[in-house]
C-alpha cells in the first residue's frame, strides 16, 4: 500500500452539517520516497510514515485482537477484508483501504438470508457513519456462505468474558456454528448492540424472507422485520414502520 489515511475526530453535535468539515487526510507515499531512509523491501515508505505518526494518534484502547475472520466478502464498502474484532472496535483490513468502526457507533446488527442465494448478509447499522473522503457509509454489509461452518477462539481472559456475559453478551471462549451466525454473535457480544433476525414472514411461495422490489433504477429485496423494513441492496436502508 502506498497510502496512509488519517481520520480526524468529528463532533456531530457541534458542527453545522451544512458546513464543510475536515474529517480525514490521505497521504500518498511513493515506495521510493527519499524522506524515509529507513524504508526497504520489508518496510515500505508508507509504513515508515505510519510508524512516525502513530505516537501522536488518539489511543482507542484497541488492545489485542479478540476475534478475527479472514477474507470476508463485504458489499458495503465493497471489497474483501480481514475483519479483526477488538474490545472497543472492529477493523476492516483490505488490500487498498482499511476502516475502523467503534462499537459505540453501532445502532443494530441484522442477519438477513439473501433471497434466491446461498449467502447471508450481516448488516451493521452505524451512527455516525463510516467516512472515506466525501463518501459516507451508513451500513457495513458483510456477506457469508449461509451453510459455511466455522470455529473461532475468543482471545479474552475468563474475567473479562464473565463481565461481558453479565451484560448479556452470551459469549463463550470457543464459538462454533455457521459463519454468519458466529460473526453476528461475536460482534453482538463484544459491542453490546442488539441483534435482529428475520421473523415469520415468507413470500407467496413460502420460501424466502423477503420480497423483490425496485428502488429507483436498482432491483433489491425488502425484508419485513419486527419493527421496520430493511431494503437490500443499493443503497441499504432501514425503514421504521413508524415512518
Residue spans for each PLM region:
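N-terminal recruitment modules of adaptor/scaffold proteins
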Residues: 5-99, 113, 121, 125-243
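Short C-terminal beta-strands that terminate individual repeats in beta-propeller domains
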Residues: 102-103
Amino acid at each position: 500500500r502506498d497510502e496512509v489515511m488519517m481520520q480526524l475526530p468529528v463532533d456531530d453535535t457541534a458542527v453545522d452539517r451544512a458546513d464543510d468539515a475536515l474529517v480525514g487526510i490521505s497521504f500518498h507515499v511513493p515506495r521510493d520516497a527519499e524522506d524515509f531512509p529507513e524504508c526497504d523491501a520489508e518496510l515500505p515508505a508508507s509504513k515508515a510514515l505510519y510508524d512516525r505518526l502513530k505516537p501522536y494518534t488518539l489511543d482507542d484502547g484497541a488492545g489485542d485482537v479478540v476475534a478475527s475472520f479472514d477474507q470476508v466478502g463485504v458489499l458495503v464498502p465493497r471489497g474483501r477484508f480481514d475483519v479483526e474484532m477488538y474490545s472497543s472496535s472492529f477493523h476492516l483490513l483490505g488490500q487498498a483501504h482499511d476502516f475502523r468502526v467503534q462499537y459505540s457507533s453501532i445502532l443494530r446488527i441484522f442477519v438477513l438470508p439473501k433471497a434466491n442465494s446461498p449467502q447471508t448478509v450481516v448488516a451493521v447499522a452505524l451512527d455516525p457513519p463510516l467516512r472515506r473522503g466525501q463518501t459516507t457509509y451508513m451500513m457495513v454489509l458483510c456477506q457469508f456462505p449461509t451453510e459455511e461452518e466455522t470455529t473461532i477462539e475468543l482471545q479474552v481472559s475468563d474475567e473479562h468474558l464473565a463481565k461481558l456475559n453479565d451484560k448479556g453478551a452470551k459469549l463463550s471462549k470457543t464459538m462454533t456454528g455457521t459463519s454468519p451466525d458466529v460473526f453476528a454473535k461475536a460482534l453482538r457480544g463484544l459491542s453490546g448492540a442488539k441483534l435482529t433476525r428475520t421473523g415469520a414472514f415468507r413470500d407467496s411461495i413460502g420460501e424466502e424472507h423477503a420480497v423483490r422490489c425496485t428502488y429507483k433504477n436498482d432491483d433489491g429485496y425488502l425484508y419485513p422485520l419486527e419493527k421496520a423494513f430493511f431494503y437490500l441492496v443499493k443503497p441499504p436502508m432501514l425503514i421504521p414502520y413508524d415512518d
